[in-house]
Structures are given as structure tokens and as C-alpha cells.
Amino acid sequence: MSEETKADETKVLDSIDILRILALLPHRYPFLMVDRIEAIDSDLSCVGYKNVTANEPHFQGHFPNNPVMPGVLIIEGMAQTAGAICIHAKGADRKPSLVYFMTIDEAKFRRPVRPGDVLEYHMTRLNKRRNMWWYRGEARVGGEIVAEARVGAMIAEE
């Protein structure tokens, strides 16, 4: 077994809670779509979590008596998760950076997400160039893929 293989086997993956997410991202309720992030491997991959509750304002009109989380908010949750790990990977405590959504490609929605579901955002980096990142994301509920997309974002330094 090589030294490189041994190092990979002992790699400790990072996690961040809601307080750290709030320190990293400028988003706030009702537009913050991620509650915690685990299995963070630098800016390469992670799993973000969103506890979907009936109290969220979009359920009042989407749809009355049949609450379904809007697909665009699921994609937004993917992007916020990816943005948070990009900023987190840069290190240091810093004020929230502005993260601008650049692209959404190959978005697919497979089944409705409802109050009571726990969304998992599985994000994997596809590419990075200067202050821009591209990720492939899968949103899952109970292990089942409910949405997927490729997202790109730019972090604007202040």
C-alpha cells in the first residue's frame, strides 16, 4: 500500500452547521435553502441538507391544499450548498461573499418534494476557473433522486 493510499484512507471530511453557513453566505430566511453541510471534501464535493417544513412561505401558493416545493428553490439549494463549500474551502473567517448564479443546465425534476421531506444536495465539482465554479448536483429524498442539474456560479470578492 502506497503512502498516498494511506493518506486517502485517513482523510477526515469536514462539516458545517447553520451558524457557519450564515457566516459564509449572504442568504437569509426565507431564501436560505440549506441547513447543514457534511462530507465536505474541500471544494470538490459535499452533501447539503434542507429540512423542508410546512411553515415555508412558498407553500401558501404552491399549491394550496397540495404543497409542493418549487423546483427552482431546489436548484437554488444546490447552488447555495456549492457556494458555501467554495467559500469555506478558501478558509479564514470572512463576511459573507456575494455568490452570483451563472448557469443552470440539464435540470430535471423527477418527483415532488413536500413538507416533512429532508432534501440532500449531493454536489460534485466539475470545473473551476479563477473565481468561477461548476458543479453537478443531485437532490435526493430518502435516497431517491428528486432533481438534478449542473450549476455554475461566480464568487465576487468585495
Swiss-Prot record:
<keyword id="KW-0443">Lipid metabolism</keyword>
<keyword id="KW-0963">Cytoplasm</keyword>
<dbReference type="InterPro" id="IPR029069">
    <property type="entry name" value="HotDog_dom_sf"/>
</dbReference>
<protein>
    <recommendedName>
        <fullName>3-hydroxyacyl-[acyl-carrier-protein] dehydratase FabZ</fullName>
        <ecNumber>4.2.1.59</ecNumber>
    </recommendedName>
</protein>
<keyword id="KW-0444">Lipid biosynthesis</keyword>
<dbReference type="InterPro" id="IPR013114">
    <property type="entry name" value="FabA_FabZ"/>
</dbReference>
<dbReference type="GO" id="GO:0006633">
    <property type="term" value="P:fatty acid biosynthetic process"/>
</dbReference>
<dbReference type="GO" id="GO:0016020">
    <property type="term" value="C:membrane"/>
</dbReference>
<comment type="similarity">
    <text>Belongs to the thioester dehydratase family. FabZ subfamily.</text>
</comment>
<feature type="active site">
    <location>
        <position position="62"/>
    </location>
</feature>
<dbReference type="InterPro" id="IPR010084">
    <property type="entry name" value="FabZ"/>
</dbReference>
<dbReference type="GO" id="GO:0019171">
    <property type="term" value="F:(3R)-hydroxyacyl-[acyl-carrier-protein] dehydratase activity"/>
</dbReference>
<keyword id="KW-0441">Lipid A biosynthesis</keyword>
<comment type="function">
    <text>Involved in unsaturated fatty acids biosynthesis. Catalyzes the dehydration of short chain beta-hydroxyacyl-ACPs and long chain saturated and unsaturated beta-hydroxyacyl-ACPs.</text>
</comment>
<keyword id="KW-0456">Lyase</keyword>
<dbReference type="Pfam" id="PF07977">
    <property type="entry name" value="FabA"/>
</dbReference>
<dbReference type="GO" id="GO:0005737">
    <property type="term" value="C:cytoplasm"/>
</dbReference>
<dbReference type="GO" id="GO:0009245">
    <property type="term" value="P:lipid A biosynthetic process"/>
</dbReference>
